[in-house]
Amino acid sequence: YPESQIDVVGGPHAGVSAFQEVRGYVDAHTHGMAFEFLGGEAHCGKPWDRYGAPYALVDCEDHTLTGGYGAALETFLSGEPGHDPVGWPTFKDWPAPHSLTHEGTYYRWMERAWRGGQRLFVNLLVENNKLCEIYPLKRNSCDDMDSIRLQARQMHKFQDYIDAQFGGPGKGFYRIVTNPFQARQVINAGKMAVIMGIETSVPFGCTF
């Protein structure tokens, strides 16, 4: 299938032992599974698709139907009245720092960052049930913890997908870790340690 290129050569750096100091840079705040939040219809595109970039890097249906105009959430967040609804392969208007409703963490782009030295990635599972209830389009539950658990499952599916691209279980660069020792091992193996976090106003269903 057609795929985004990374245009990077050479092997990623690693440690000489599993226990030494680690080197690399950190992305400490990302919402990599945001395609499932706010009911699952507010974010356009996703980090991967079994059929590659042409299916993962697409605009939301409501944006496409109006030619990129009338996308209220995108317009409010970006300050732009409209945008080119075509993602792959032209990417005229997105991804972009001001375009918060469009995918920016496609797996090949993350691979480029990893090959360029990123070694720690903090992925925050995110939800806001009140905004979800207000947004008119949805396919998922607005309950914070339902959404958080769904995004956590998607993180593991994402890891499995990257593993498959690199030859099998455990071979991919994206490795979910649960403690500092695991993170050190992963980074010194030349891979990227991924920390799962939560950003929600209603953790564990306390007030919803």
Where do the protein language model's features map onto the residues?
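N-terminal hydrophobic targeting/anchoring segments and the immediately downstream early-domain regions
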Residues: 1-208
